[in-house]
From Swiss-Prot:
The keyword Cell membrane does not apply. It catalyses: an aromatic L-alpha-amino acid + 2-oxoglutarate = an aromatic oxo-acid + L-glutamate. It comes from the Bacteria. This is Aromatic amino acid aminotransferase. Residues 1-42 are annotated as: Disordered. Aminotransferase that catalyzes the conversion of aromatic amino acids and 2-oxoglutarate into corresponding aromatic oxo acids and L-glutamate. Its EC number is 2.6.1.57. Homodimer. InterPro entries: Aminotrans_II_pyridoxalP_BS (IPR001917), Aminotransferase_I/II_large (IPR004839), ArAT (IPR024892), HisP_aminotrans (IPR005861), HistidinolP_aminotransfase (IPR050106), PyrdxlP-dep_Trfase (IPR015424), PyrdxlP-dep_Trfase_major (IPR015421), PyrdxlP-dep_Trfase_small (IPR015422). One of its GO terms (molecular function) is pyridoxal phosphate binding. Its cofactor is pyridoxal 5'-phosphate. The modification N6-(pyridoxal phosphate)lysine is found at residue 223.
Length: 359
């Protein structure tokens, strides 16, 4: 009997590592603080939970593939035409849709590094070539990013605020960068953490896109809105880009519960922003405590802080884990720590204070 041959699979997959999400740990005293995934520490508001419960009565029906109610609500909220709004299963889903619409073998996708770790994974899956541009002082080097654009570049990602460093580029420099990128190259402003931004110099991408047809903005309901489990994000861009993104959406990918919860969240936005203010206050408290204790922590406009630890990264993460605190290590580089509830933040600060080294 001849040896069975395995099914043919794309060779491009051989070099792509699996995405590793933040995990949960439990300490010896039973503490389990998950500060590894940049999730909101707050559950959905009562009105949002009620909307989910009401929508559950129709789970035997397919969701609206056009998500018309949510699309209209987003258009009203951001003062854009409905044909400028596209939806996806979280901003990661939209990133994949964008790559399917623009990338092909031989094409290049440019982004800062380190940045959102899904960028190289999704770029590789699309068969395109990822181009990493090193950060400068933990933030985007926009001049180097512009210089990396070639005639093979199809898309540029700008994560603002940047994940995992939390740093943000300012309006003047970002606008200048956008105006240097060739018109045929799509620039995607990934603003997953926009709601946490307090610095007025950090631009709202929705304002920058309006007179730039090659700029699109990504947002998500997973972070500040607290709907990470439901996977719903949106893109705001010009019709040619939006039409392409809509075509690459897997049918019914944005489920019925997600649509209902997102609409209800927009209606309760003021209450949600009050929760954001609590997280921002905790963010500033945590960073100030770390700085006072001798740590180097870049300014952050997101819901996390970044500690560049180099070769001590995994050791520090292990010390946190032993205390029942999950953080997100990037081996050889640093640790990202999400802002949680005050008690969990205090537990993390205790580990940081007792750790024998500083960065």
């Amino acid at each position: 009997m001849s040896e069975r041959k395995p099914p043919y699979l794309r060779s491009a997959l051989d070099s792509i590592p699996p995405y590793r999400p933040g995990r949960k740990v439990v300490g010896p005293d039973g503490r389990s603080a998950k500060l590894s995934s940049n999730e909101s520490p707050f559950g959905p508001l009562p009105s949002v939970r009620q909307a989910i419960a009401d929508a559950a009565a129709d789970l035997n029906r397919y969701p609206d593939p056009a998500a018309a109610e949510l699309t209209a609500a987003l258009a009203r909220r951001f003062h854009v035409p409905e044909e400028h709004v596209a939806l996806g299963a979280g901003s990661v889903g939209l990133l994949q849709q964008l790559l399917e619409a623009t990338a092909e073998p031989g094409a290049e996708v440019v982004y800062a590094w380190r940045s959102f770790e899904a960028y190289p994974l999704l770029t590789g899956l699309a068969g395109a070539t990822p181009i990493h541009v090193p950060l400068r002082e933990e933030t985007h080097d926009l001049e180097a990013l512009a210089a990396a654009v070639t005639d093979r570049t199809r898309m540029v990602f700008v994560c603002n605020p940047n994940n995992p460093t939390g740093t943000a580029v300012r309006e003047t420099e970002l606008a200048e960068f956008l105006d240097t990128v060739p018109e045929h190259v799509l620039v995607v402003l990934d603003e997953a953490y926009r709601e946490y931004v307090q610095d007025p110099r950090v631009p709202d991408g929705v304002q920058l896109y309006r007179d730039r047809p090659n700029v699109a903005v990504l947002r998500t309901f997973s972070k500040a809105y607290g709907l990470a489990a439901l996977r719903v994000g949106f893109l705001i861009g010009h019709p040619q880009v939006v039409d392409a993104v809509r075509k690459t959406l897997v049918p019914f990918a944005v489920n019925h519960l997600a649509q209902a919860a997102a609409v209800a969240s927009l209606a309760a936005e003021q209450e949600l922003l009050e929760r954001v203010a609590v997280t921002v206050k905790e963010r500033e408290r945590v960073r100030a405590a770390l700085l006072a204790d001798g740590w180097t922590v870049p300014e952050t406009e997101a819901n996390f802080v970044w500690l560049r630890l180099g070769e001590d990264t995994l050791d520090f993460a292990a010390a946190c884990e032993q205390a029942g605190i999950a953080v997100r290590p990037f081996a050889g580089e640093g640790v990202r720590v999400s802002i949680g509830l005050p008690d969990d933040n205090d537990a993390f600060l205790t580990v940081a204070r007792t750790y024998p080294k500083r960065n």
